[in-house]
């Protein structure tokens, strides 16, 4: 559990002490801590989601970069089939992006750039990414529809 505490307390929430943009060294440190805490991946993902939800607007995009870095490193290290982070992030991805889009308007293009890279590299399926791109264009987020 100490690797999880290191990730959440020391790495993730210490981002608030730095002025964006976040250095490559800091991002690498956060990513390594997340991968080290893979046994607690659900908590790692929840920590990132909570950070994005609660941080100041100027830290929204760095929060996305943390998410991106963790997913890419996990896929690189363990392979696409064994990556646990991307499937977990996708569970609440609409809500996470609703918070991300509360960033300064200049930062929205950075979010779209990450989404386009995810689409190009098949990090998430198109049916996950397309609604997020639509949200960037000002369309309302999709709602869950239940058939009775």
Q: What is the meaning of each model-derived region?
A:
Residues 1-148:
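Eukaryote-specific intrinsically disordered, low-complexity regulatory regions enriched
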């Amino acid at each position: 559990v100490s690797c999880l505490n290191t990730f959440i307390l020391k790495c993730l929430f210490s981002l608030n002490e730095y002025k964006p943009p976040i250095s490559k060294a800091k991002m690498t440190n956060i990513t390594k801590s997340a991968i080290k805490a893979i046994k607690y991946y659900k908590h790692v993902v929840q920590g990132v989601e909570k950070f994005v939800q609660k941080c100041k607007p100027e830290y929204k995009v760095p929060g996305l970069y943390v998410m991106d870095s963790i997913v890419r490193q996990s896929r690189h290290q363990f392979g696409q089939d064994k990556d646990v982070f991307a499937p977990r992030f996708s569970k609440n991805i609409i809500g996470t992006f609703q918070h991300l889009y509360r960033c300064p308007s200049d930062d929205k293009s950075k979010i779209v750039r990450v989404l386009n890279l995810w689409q190009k590299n098949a990090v998430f399926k198109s049916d996950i990414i397309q609604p997020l791109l639509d949200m960037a264009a000002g369309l309302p987020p999709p709602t869950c529809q239940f058939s009775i």
